[in-house]
Amino acid sequence: MVTIAAIIYEPGNSIKNKTGTWRTFRPILDNEKCVKCENCYIFCPEGAIQEDENGNFKIDYDYCKGCLICMNECPVNAITKVREEK
């Protein structure tokens, strides 16, 4: 169990400045491969990954900076990257 105070659990530290336009790479989460370990949710520095009502994780691309920490922390490679198109 992770202490809630140890993570950003929702977008908000950049709420007035949507940081999604900074990306070079976009992380793509494959919920078929996901084992629900919550690493992506825990390690996202922007709180841009949220769990939906079905228990699947979704990336809020308005706030995702494309740092790919989520991809690096995923133990089952359920997150891949694609180059962002301008």
UniProtKB/Swiss-Prot annotation:
Claim: Transport is one of the keywords in the record: yes
SUPFAM superfamilies referenced in this protein's UniProt entry, alphabetically: 4Fe-4S ferredoxins
InterPro entries found in the cross-reference section: 4Fe4S_Fe-S-bd, 4Fe4S_Fe_S_CS, PorD_KorD, Pyruvate_synthase_PorD
Molecular function GO labels: 4 iron, 4 sulfur cluster binding; metal ion binding; oxidoreductase activity, acting on the aldehyde or oxo group of donors, iron-sulfur protein as acceptor
Keyword presence, Transport: yes
Cofactor binding mode and count: Binds 2 [4Fe-4S] clusters.
Keywords: 4Fe-4S, Electron transport, Iron, Iron-sulfur, Metal-binding, Repeat, Transport
Binding site for [4Fe-4S] cluster 1: 34, 37, 40, 74
Amino acids binding [4Fe-4S] cluster 2: 44, 64, 67, 70
Cofactor names: [4Fe-4S] cluster
PANTHER family (UniProt xref): PYRUVATE SYNTHASE SUBUNIT PORD
Protein name per Swiss-Prot or TrEMBL: Pyruvate synthase subunit PorD
Organism in which the protein naturally occurs: Methanocaldococcus jannaschii (strain ATCC 43067 / DSM 2661 / JAL-1 / JCM 10045 / NBRC 100440) (Methanococcus jannaschii)
